[in-house]
Amino acid sequence: MDIIVKYIDELLEKSTPEAPMWNIEKIKQGLKSKWNYIDGCMIKAVLQMYAISKDEKYLKFADDFIDYRVFEDGTIDGYNVNAGKTLFELYDLTGKEKYRKAIDLVYSQIEIMPRCKSGNFWHKDIYPNQVWLDGMYMGQPFYLEYETRFNNRKNYDDIFSQFKFVIENMRNPLNGLYFHAMDTSREAFWCDKVTGLSQLSWLRAIGWYSMALLDSLEIVDNSDHKFDAEVKMLQDAFVDLINSMIKYQDE
């Protein structure tokens, strides 16, 4: 834990909202840093440090960082659903109404996202009809948390359906790993023209996906056991994936 604290503290000391060290490549290129998925991942980690240590410096950094990007009317300097995950906890901890407004704004973006025929969200507008493992991490936990907190779980079935599609169509039965992406239209140059799948399993994407499963399991409200089967589906998929990855770990 001491090593983690030292690493995080040094990272934060050298970072500002305008120039976070985790986006150093953009800084070196002279590009402006905007609200992005890396910010979401890193600020979630900072908030985890606050939850564990109760050291106010972590909360202050996270709040200052996100506050800089979110305007009083809830509009945001940039578009990214993943970074929106930080807003729930910061709203709880600070009570800032602009965070609540920003949560609704991000959700409104989810409502109009284009979808594949399967019902899954496109990964991005520039990747039509494509489902990527990365996108399951970037979008589904936010979607699930909003439904849990503010929408009476009305779209739980939609969320579980998107996970089910990935589990049934993107898992490699030969090794238990998942292919990085699938083009449901079979048009992308990289996809198998029969299955629509990419040729490779990518460790980083599998990491995103495993966290999508785990984060969703932590968020889901199944107190009335209405979604027992769906929760078990996610649990089984997570355990199966971890057991499959262990076979490939370095000794």
Segments from the language model and where they lie:
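Glycan-recognition and catalytic cores of secretory/periplasmic carbohydrate-active enzymes
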Residues: M1-E251
